[in-house]
């Protein structure tokens, strides 16, 4: 697999990058970032790009890939619907519409979230916007897959870029084994989620929209 990763410096992206580099079936990983990851690996190449609404200047470097993992996302708290849509729908589609003609058979995996509203008509703003984004990607890529995780526990030194979020995970992490036991179909971790996403990119997912239980089932299968 030759893969492109957006969002490599975020918590989910960090975990996914780790698993992509460890996976012997992944030969090449390109990360597109606003700031360097600081990660060095023979399989890894990196493009530092400032404008995530316009990829025309680097488009020539984005062809020849089998999969794209799009892990960028922001909270909707404190944002108007117009602002959140620009940071979610518009930003994602800027990358997707650049990649689609270059890699028409690409598997495009988008990290959304459980509770996303596919009807786009619900009362919850973030869920409507995420739903619109998912629907646009499903129309654009025949091999698109939507990733809707629930609670995710960071593993293997993975950390959220946000200091407040890191503190919250440090507190909740103490109870992670209990949460996992109580909610086995809702609580996952960065390693398991990443394995599920890689398998989905290889066409092993049972459907195009994967909820928490689907991701846990797919990610917990032992490697053959």
Predicted regions located by residue number:
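N-terminal Rossmann NAD(P)H-binding glycine-rich loop of SDR-like oxidoreductase domains
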Residues: 2-23
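NAD(P)-binding Rossmann-fold cofactor-contacting core
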Residues: 29-39
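Conserved Rossmann-fold NAD(P)-dependent oxidoreductase catalytic core, especially the SDR/UDP-sugar
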Residues: 33-35, 74, 82, 86-132, ...
């Amino acid at each position: 697999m030759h893969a492109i990763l957006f969002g490599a410096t975020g918590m989910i992206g960090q975990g996914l990058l780790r698993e992509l580099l460890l996976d012997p079936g992944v030969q090449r990983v390109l990360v597109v970032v606003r700031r360097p990851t600081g990660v060095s690996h023979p399989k890894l190449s990196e493009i530092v790009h400032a404008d995530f609404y316009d990829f025309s200047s680097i488009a020539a470097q984005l062809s020849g890939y089998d999969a794209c993992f799009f892990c960028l996302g922001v909270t909707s708290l404190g944002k108007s619907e117009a602002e959140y849509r620009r940071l979610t729908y518009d930003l994602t589609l800027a990358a997707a519409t650049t990649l689609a003609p270059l890699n028409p058979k690409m598997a495009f995996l988008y990290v959304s979230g459980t509770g996303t509203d596919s009807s786009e008509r619900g009362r919850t703003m973030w869920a409507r916007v995420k739903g619109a984004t998912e629907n646009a990607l499903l129309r654009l890529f025949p091999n698109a897959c939507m990733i809707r995780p629930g609670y995710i526990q960071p593993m293997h030194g993975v950390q959220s870029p946000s200091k407040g979020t890191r503190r919250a995970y440090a507190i909740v992490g103490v109870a992670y084994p209990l949460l996992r036991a109580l909610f086995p179909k809702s609580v996952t971790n960065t390693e398991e989620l990443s394995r599920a996403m890689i398998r989905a990119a290889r066409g092993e997912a049972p459907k195009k929209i994967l909820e928490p239980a689907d991701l846990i089932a797919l990610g917990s299968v032992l490697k053959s």
